Amino acid sequence: MPKLQFKSIPAELAPMDLLLEADPSTEQIHTYLDGSDIYTVLSDGQTVGVCVLKPHSETTLELMNIAVEPTQQGSGIGRQLLQYVISESRNKQAKELVLGTGTFGYQLAFYQREGFRVVGIDKDFFLDNYDEPVIENGIQHKDMLRLQLIL
């Protein structure tokens, strides 16, 4: 595997095609891009991953979006990007990293492997916040799990 390069970029350069891999709503993405820290991962000069962290306070950051180029999924890039972002969060003196994800799917195990724990449920989040149904593996997402990693 080629050496990966991690880079912070401004919101206007965020790769929308990749962000849409993790969040199917352009409107939702635009609600959290401004004021967020955006990190990309490059392989051979090509952007293959992206992550968006939104500060909620001096000690709490929310992982709003993390995505890897579909042809590169399963190669460990997402795990390395998440570990990089966790390290960057600690460097910023954050005390916790929080996120929301669906109640099923590979994403839940992905986060739990890195130490995130379920701390709550936002009932009907996907029904109330998305114009179109969010479907994964033929099942509609309705509720959002809230996860937390104590740094």
Model-identified regions with their sequence ranges:
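Conserved beta-strand segments that form the floor/walls of ligand-binding pockets within enzyme
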Residues: 62, 67, 76, 98, ...
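Short hydrophobic/aromatic beta-strand or adjacent loop that forms the aromatic wall/cage
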Residues: 36-38, 141-146
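Short acidic/polar active-site loop segments enriched in Thr and Asp
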Residues: 59, 95, 117
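Conserved acetyl-CoA-binding loop-helix of GNAT-fold acetyltransferases
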Residues: 74-87, 113
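Conserved catalytic-core motifs of GNAT/GCN5-like acyltransferases
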Residues: 98-100, 112, 117-138
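Short beta-strand-to-coil "C-cap" segments at the C-terminal boundary of structured domains/repeats
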Residues: 148-151
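Conserved GNAT acetyl-CoA-binding A-motif
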Residues: 89-102
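Acetyl-CoA-dependent GNAT
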Residues: 2-71
